[in-house]
Swiss-Prot record:
Family: Belongs to the fluoride channel Fluc/FEX (TC 1.A.43) family.
Catalytic activity: fluoride(in) = fluoride(out)
An individual GO BP term: cellular detoxification of fluoride
HAMAP family cross-referenced by the UniProt entry: FluC
Protein name listed in UniProt: Fluoride-specific ion channel FluC
Record membrane topology: Multi-pass membrane protein
Source organism, top-level taxon: Bacteria
Any one GO cellular component localisation term in the record: plasma membrane
General function of this protein: Fluoride-specific ion channel. Important for reducing fluoride concentration in the cell, thus reducing its toxicity.
Chain residues that bind Na(+): G74, T77
Keywords: Cell inner membrane, Cell membrane, Ion channel, Ion transport, Membrane, Metal-binding, Sodium, Transmembrane, Transmembrane helix, Transport
Organism: Acinetobacter baylyi (strain ATCC 33305 / BD413 / ADP1)
Length: 126
């Protein structure tokens, strides 16, 4: 039990630090488009897709899965920030930006998760 908690906590610390750093570096790039939030959600989608395939095909301690998926990806990706940014755009009546942001986050994250799965499959065959 304690090793599981420690695995999640260590992954979460690294994921949160990376999310903070990427947001700090990229969220001010475009005025109406929070690029940092988009990047962490897309990268997190890719990592989780790759990790799901990896853990399904390797016999590893469940602590690795807890570290990567629950801890790291859970802290790296951010649905609440995405939601707040969309609401902010809607309140400013920037409907086109809000729809674009929703589309990029949802479709992009799904696509990146599939790409993560396919990347693992490709790498495991070569």
């Amino acid at each position: 039990m304690y090793s599981s908690l420690l695995s999640i906590a260590c992954g979460a610390v690294l994921g949160a630090w990376l999310r903070w750093f990427v947001g700090l570096k990229f969220n001010s790039t475009f005025q109406n488009f929070p690029l940092g939030t988009i990047l962490v959600n897309l990268v997190g989608g890719f990592i989780i897709g790759f990790a799901i395939a990896l853990f399904a095909n390797m016999q590893l301690s469940s602590n690795y899965k807890l570290f990567v998926i629950t801890g790291f990806c859970g802290a790296l990706t951010t649905f609440s920030t995405f939601s707040a940014e969309v609401i902010d755009l809607l309140q400013q009546q920037k409907y086109g930006f809000a729809i674009a942001l929703i589309t990029i986050h949802l479709m992009g994250s799904l696509l990146c998760t599939v790409l993560g799965l396919l990347s693992y499959q490709w790498l495991s065959q070569h």
